């Protein structure tokens, strides 16, 4: 039995033979999977250097890297200490590397923890994920940052609710 629940109606499901996977990613213009062996740092840095988009919006663009959604972009940027409204092309090599590495770390941890159960998400066995227990900024507006004690803020950026620490993630 296969059960698929998508309350917000964002998802689709397709069944592919393993040998068709690469062609599928290319046809859908999906970026690489955020795994060490697939997510090339130099390609990532070059893409950031060419874009004036805010880094949050750029990370949500699935052509850059596949799989990052709103929750995990907030968490990646908090860990990397980058303001979500920063222009992608202004990031230093060190900052771009931090985002790259934290993308791999956050999504790896999310998979390990079974995802984030915020409202209705459960796995195929009906079990809640536990990654939400490890969120540092997402859905933490008006709470203290665990790193510095500053109050977490929530703003709208690119039409998305965006959580960040104004002290740890300074805009400049």
Regions found by a protein language model. Name each.
Residues 1-67, 72-79, 87:
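Phosphate/anion-contacting hairpin/loop surfaces
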Residues 62, 142, 162:
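Residues immediately within or flanking Cys/His clusters that coordinate Zn2+
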Residues 81-90, 96:
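RNA substrate-recognition surfaces in RNA-acting enzymes
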Residues 103, 122-133, 147-150:
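Short Cys/His-rich Zn2+-coordinating modules
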Residues 132-141, 155-158:
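Short, flexible, mixed-charge glycine/proline-rich loop motifs
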Residues 145-148, 165-168:
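Short cysteine-rich clusters marking metal-coordination/redox-active sites
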Residues 152-153, 170:
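Short functional micro-motifs and their immediate structural scaffolds
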């Amino acid at each position: 039995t296969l059960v698929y629940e998508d309350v917000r109606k964002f998802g689709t499901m397709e069944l592919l033979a393993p040998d068709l996977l690469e062609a599928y990613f290319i046809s859908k213009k999906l970026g690489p999977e955020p795994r060490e062996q697939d997510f090339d740092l130099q390609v990532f840095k070059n893409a950031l250097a060419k874009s004036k988009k805010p880094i949050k919006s750029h990370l949500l663009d699935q052509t850059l890297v596949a799989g990052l959604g709103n929750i995990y972009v907030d968490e990646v940027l908090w860990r990397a200490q980058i303001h979500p409204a920063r222009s992608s092309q202004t990031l230093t090599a060190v900052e771009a590397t931090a985002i790259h590495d934290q993308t791999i770390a956050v999504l790896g941890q999310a998979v390990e923890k079974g995802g984030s159960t915020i409202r209705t998400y459960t796995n195929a066995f009906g079990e809640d994920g536990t990654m939400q227990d490890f969120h540092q900024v997402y859905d933490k507006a008006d709470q203290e940052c665990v790193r510095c004690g500053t109050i977490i803020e929530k703003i709208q950026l690119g039409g998305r609710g965006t959580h960040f620490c104004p002290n740890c993630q300074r805009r400049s």
